[in-house]
């Protein structure tokens, strides 16, 4: 602890911007480096979000809901309306997955409410010198989540609409089915897919 007090402001910032990682990152996004703190806190917040949603479902009553049940029901209604406007088929997997990802990301961002020095100081007691507890501050983590959501949306787009329906929508929406409009429709739909997920 005495050596931490001797850090300059630049050293302090560099210490707090360094992940507990398997190696040194060569670029801002480097998938060959594993950031252990990002993985640990992401999985921890996923378990907490699943536990919270399970607890809300288990304790739900048909009578007057409590504050927690009301908040979860509002989230469920919001996600259901969003999924209804986007997916016009079977939403039995998509809506719960979207709810889980939403709560998970909110909880990962909520870690930022914990004082910045508290968790690294606790980890330092156990010999962990670098700890960056906010998973969404790691571009590898956020890119991983967005790529997974993009792949899920493409998969379920194919599954619900079929290959023919998906490609027809890719080239004919929103400007029409004329062959001169196909490049514009395709470009706009690709931008839309990337904007929704990445």
Where are these regions (language model features)?
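Selective transmembrane helix interface/packing segments
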Residues: 1-198
